[in-house]
Regions:
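Intrinsically disordered, low-complexity segments enriched in serine/threonine/proline/glycine
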Residues: 15-16
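Hydrophobic helical h-region of N-terminal Sec-dependent signal peptides
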Residues: 32-36
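Exported/periplasmic ABC-transporter solute-binding proteins
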Residues: 42-84, 88-94, 100-291
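General secretory precursor processing signal
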Residues: 8-11, 45
Length: 291
């Protein structure tokens, strides 16, 4: 014991104290690092949101996100890719919200739909095409290749160029469902993803026919794109008809989520469904939930 006390006056005590300090530091540092990382992760989640999915909703959501960021400082990253991507990303935790331009299916009951607006799907042709209306049977004949010339419908003696939506797009799903078609029966000349691709294809080809969001089609036509929206089942393709429940290919515009919403997600949802934002929906020719 005397030896220990004597040695501590020299170097032994310092060695022991130094070792104890190093051991304590070794234990504390990982805990501190983990705590800092956890805090950093929490800060990132509350200061940013990711929203992916429907190309129909994406332009509207981008503008709403910009307004929200200006107001709150919370960054909102909006990415399109189709409603299918919105569903998948939300389930995998890659997105806080998925944009889905249809009602959820029974097998998607693990997700929660937050209705933000309404829209419809319109058949479109070039404004220079003399054909002004087609019934459902004629549209089916065109899309299955049974009729391949506009002359069969009082139009020009020219081949019909069929523009069809890609898999994973809710616009395609609803189109097929309405006309009682399976995708393998459709004989397209062009397959597109984004609505803007469909607008560009039909606006640039007098012999093309396609289908896109009513809101997007009206927006682009008003901006000068040479488009004509055809009546569907005899009902004009207008927002008024959608609003009154008369248009046969109307649809929900949803943000979907999984599990409990974070505070940031809840606050964003409240912001975009506030009646004060209704004007932005009207700018994009959509019907907002709150008016």
């Amino acid at each position: 014991m005397d030896w220990f006390c004597n040695k501590s006056e020299g170097g032994a005590s310092k060695d022991i104290k130094s070792g104890l300090w190093e051991l304590t530091t070794m234990i504390k540092l990982p805990v501190l690092v983990m705590a800092l990382l956890a805090l950093a992760g929490c800060g990132t989640r509350e200061d940013s949101l990711v929203i992916t999915g429907s190309s129909t909703i994406a332009p509207l959501m981008t503008e709403l996100a910009e307004r929200y960021e200006e107001t709150t400082g919370v960054q909102v990253d909006v990415q399109s890719g189709g409603s299918g991507r919105g569903i998948s990303d939300t389930r995998q935790g890659l997105a806080d919200f998925g944009m889905v331009s249809r009602a959820l299916k029974a097998e998607e009951g693990d997700l929660t739909a937050h209705l933000i607006g309404r829209d419809g799907i319109a058949m479109i042709v070039n404004a220079l095409n003399p054909v002004t209306r087609l019934n459902d049977a004629q549209i089916v004949a065109i899309y299955t290749g049974e009729q391949q010339s506009w002359s069969a419908f009082g139009g020009n003696d020219a081949a019909i160029n069929v523009v069809h939506k890609a898999d994973g797009r809710s616009t395609q799903e609803l189109f097929l469902e309405h006309f009682g078609l399976s995708n393998d029966r459709v004989k397209p000349d062009m397959v597109i993803g984004e609505n803007q691709q469909g607008i560009k294809a039909v606006a640039g080809d007098v012999n093309a026919i396609g289908y896109v969001s009513i809101g997007t089609a009206i927006y682009e036509a008003d901006a000068g794109a040479p488009l004509r929206l055809l009546p569907l089942s005899g009902v004009p393709a207008t927002l008024e008809q959608v609003d009154q429940g008369h248009y046969p290919l109307s649809r929900e515009l949803n943000l979907v989520s999984q599990g409990e919403l974070s505070d940031a997600a809840s606050e964003f949802l409240a912001f975009i469904t506030d009646p004060g934002q209704a004007g932005i929906y009207h700018d994009y020719y959509f019907l907002p939930v709150s008016r």
